[in-house]
Swiss-Prot record:
Protein name per UniProt: V-type ATP synthase subunit F
Homology family: Belongs to the V-ATPase F subunit family.
One Pfam short name: ATP-synt_F
Xref: SUPFAM superfamilies: AtpF-like (SSF159468)
A molecular-function term among this protein's GO annotations: proton-transporting ATP synthase activity, rotational mechanism
Keywords linked to the UniProt accession: ATP synthesis, Hydrogen ion transport, Ion transport, Transport
Gene designation: atpF
InterPro entries, sorted: ATPase_V1-cplx_f_g_su, ATPase_V1-cplx_fsu_bac/arc, ATPase_V1_fsu_sf
Gene3D superfamilies named in the record: ATPase, V1 complex, subunit F
Function per UniProt: Produces ATP from ADP in the presence of a proton gradient across the membrane.
């Protein structure tokens, strides 16, 4: 039997609720401590991708950094309904540069 990973999104209600329609497991968190605990808990529960709003991620950089060195789960930062802080884009830029040895963005 093939292992199927789940997808989760963590953030404030207004930013993440629409993901439920797509079949993504939604975890509504309001502060950094709760977000940190939620990420650590669901990372152990067969989630392959965890989307986190940039608004929360900016307050838990050590947790995000810890999971960036892991293959699974992939923690991906997304803008909240308040707009982008460009943290996610910056991380993608760094990963692309690391992978190909040149900055392209």
């Amino acid at each position: 039997m093939k292992l199927m990973y789940k997808i989760a999104v963590i953030g404030d209600k207004d930013s993440v609720l629409a993901f439920k329609i797509l079949g993504v497991d939604v975890f509504i968190t309001l502060d950094a401590q709760e977000a940190r605990k939620t990420i650590d808990r669901i990372a152990k529960e067969n989630y392959g991708i965890i989307f986190v709003t940039e608004q929360l991620a900016k307050d838990i950089p050590e947790t995000i950094k810890r999971y960036n060195s892991e293959i699974i789960p992939a923690v991906i930062l997304i803008p909240s309904n308040k707009g982008s802080l460009n943290i996610g884009l910056t991380n993608i830029d760094k990963n692309v540069e690391k992978a190909i040895g040149s900055k392209i963005m």
